Amino acid sequence: MKLLLLGDLHFSLKSSSSRVDSIVEEFLYRFKDLRDKIAENGIMAVICTGDIFNTPYQSPETIFKLSKEIESLGVPFITAIGNHDEIGYRLENWQTQTSLGILKKITKNLHISDMYLGEDFTASFQHFIPEVDTETNGKYLSYYSESKVDNYLIHVVHGYMVSGKLPFHVVNPSEIADTNADFVLAGHYHKPVYEKIGNKMFYNPGSFANLTYDDKDRICEVGLLDTSTNALERLSVPYDKGTWVIKTDTKFKKKELILEETIVETDSVALITQIAKNKQLQADTIERYWEVQNGE
C-alpha cells in the first residue's frame, strides 16, 4: 500500500509577522499539489505528524476551511496530536477544548487515535507529551510502539528526532535503532530528517508550512512510502515562496543579538536563569525562544 507522509501542518489563515502576503493561497496551492500526488501515485492514506493548527484556538472560518481541504484529499487523513494542538501541553484537553476537537467532529476522513489499522499496515501514535524525548532506563520509550502486530508497523511520534546535535536535547535515530517499528515518522522539528539503519527507516518530512523568515527558502517535502516494498520516495512540493520582510530596526537587532548570545547555553536551567537576570531581554524575545525550543 502507498502512503503519503506529511510533516507538521501548522494551518492558519494568518501570515506570520515576517510575511506581507497571504499565507492562505500558499496553503491552498500545496493542498492542490497533495491531491495531484494522491491521484498520480495511487495513495491510499495520508499520515501526518501533528500540529494541525498553528495555535489550539482558531476561528470557525479557519476550521471549516481546513476541514474542506482535508476532505478534498479523498483518502483517510491520519494524524498525531502535536503540542500546538493542545492547551498547556495537556493531551487530555484536545477533544473538548481545542479547534482540533471541532475539526475531528466535522471532518469525515480525519482519524485521530492511538492506533490505526490499515489494510496491510498498522500506524501507532505517540502524541505530544512534555516528556516525549525523555530517556528512561536507557531507552527513549516514546519511540517504541506498544502495538503487537505482524504487518508493517509505522510509529508516529511528535518529538525531536534529529540527526546530529542542536542547542537543546534531541533524540538521534541511532539511539532508537532497535525500535520495534519498521518505520518511525517524527514531527516537531521543522527541517527534514532521514536515516536508514538496517531495514528500518527514520523520517521527518519537515513542516508543511514556511512560517518564519529563517525558514523561507526551505523546500517543502512529503514522503511517499510503499509498505509492500519498504521503499520511501521523498517528493518536493512546489510553491510560491511568498513575500517576506526583514525587520531591521535597531531595537529588534539588539534583541536578536541578546537572544543569539543567550541561546548558546545548552542547559535549560542555566538559560532560564540567565534570562531572568537579563533586564534587557524583552518578553517577546523570551516567547520566541520558547517557540524555537518547542519546534514552532
Name the predicted role of every residue range.
Residues K241-E296:
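Non-catalytic terminal accessory segments
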Residues L5-G7, A45-D51, F77-H84, H111-M115, ...:
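Active-site neighborhood of phospho(di)ester-bond hydrolases with catalytic His/Asp-centered motifs
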Residues H10-L13, N54-Y57, N83-L91, Y116-E119, ...:
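Active-site environment of divalent metal-dependent phosphoester hydrolases
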Residues S15-S17, G50-E69, E86-I106, F125, ...:
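Metal-dependent catalytic neighborhoods of phosphoester/phosphodiester hydrolases
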Residues L166-R234:
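Conserved beta-sheet core of the metallophosphoesterase superfamily
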Residues K65-G74, V171-T179:
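Catalytic-core regions built around general acid/base machinery
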Residues M1-K65, Y140-V149, E296:
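N-terminal active-site segment of His-dependent metallophosphoesterases
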Residues I81, D85-E175:
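Conserved catalytic scaffold of divalent metal-dependent phosphoesterases
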